[in-house]
Amino acid sequence: MNIFTTFLFMIVIGAVIGAATNHLAIKMLFRPYKPYYLFGKQLPFTPGLIPKRRDEVAKQVGVLVMEHLLTPEGIQKRFESSEAKQEILHTVHRLIDKGADMEITVLSLLERFGVSHADVKADEWLHHWSDRKLASLLKKYNEQTLSELLPLEVENKISSKIPDAADYILKRGIHYFESEEGKARLGNMIDDFLKERGMLGGMVQMFLGNSSLIDRVHPEIIKFLRNAETKKFLTDLLVQEWEKVKQFSLQELDDKWNVKELAYSVKKQLLSHFSTKVILDKPVGSYVSEVAVDLKIYLAPVLVDKGIKAASNALEGLLAKLKFEDIIREQIELFPLKKMEELVISISNNELKMITFLGGFLGGLIGAIQAIFVTLF
């Protein structure tokens, strides 16, 4: 009975000591959370292992993650995988569809982003920009001739239309002088001509009479205007003048006919019929829906590919600038020790219990061996 009691006692004591030792060792991984002092001296094993080495652990985890887990090569491989491309492409398609369904106007959308009266600002910008652009162009081509400024096809087109212009002028002249107004104007011109000639004019008017003179001159003028030689003469005259005008520089044209002022007037007149409000006061979806199919088929794949390539090329530098290892280290250092302890225990609770039981088993086994030695010796 004494031997059995000794065996049982030593086995129980050994098991309790072994289990308690392992349990205490597990607890000492985290506890105590802070150092304790006695007579100004820090007590051993305070704080626990992980609290004491937390800064070093945080630093090593950060280095481990960046050098072996979150590497640029691994992220690039993930980025450039077909699955990632398809997922990004589907996301872009959803955004396009969402844009096509937007009923808010462009003006209202811009106002949401802090851009008020965008139409007025756009019109003002357009007017100022067109003024600067036109002034720059006029200055640039100031010394060039009209022949140099006009495209060859335009110059040839104008030259080919000169006979038509001469014919039109003569026809309008015939039409005018055949009218009562034209005939009356012709009579007034004859009267003025004769008055300027003094006595000689008076004598002619006395012999022929004003009506007789008009009746004689009027048919001759119409005949002159209908004559083919007159048309040829006028055509040649217009051609000669056109050749002269083509050699004028832009500055010379402006000096003679204020063409620069005319250019500004034409520009102003054209812009007066255009307002960006007509464009900006429409729903965003009306614009997106018109090009949604083309955006999905042509633009989206190209943008996704180029975006992934650009991101991959810039990834290594970006990760270096972001310093993820420092972020990981800082987060681990700020993570509450109690939460960390609960997290580790919740994950490995069964394994930690088995370690405690193993300590008890080994302690009991050692106690049994000691009991044998005590009994025998």
UniProtKB/Swiss-Prot annotation:
Cross-referenced Pfam families: DUF445 (PF04286)
Transmembrane regions listed in the UniProt entry: 1-21, 357-377
Family under the similarity heading: Belongs to the UPF0754 family.
Protein name: UPF0754 membrane protein BPUM_0927
UniProt-listed InterPro entries: DUF445, UCP032178
Keywords, comma-separated and alphabetical: Cell membrane, Membrane, Transmembrane, Transmembrane helix
Chief location: membrane
GO cellular component: plasma membrane
The UniProt record lists the keyword Cell membrane: yes
Subcellular location as annotated: Cell membrane
Species in which this protein is naturally found: Bacillus pumilus (strain SAFR-032)
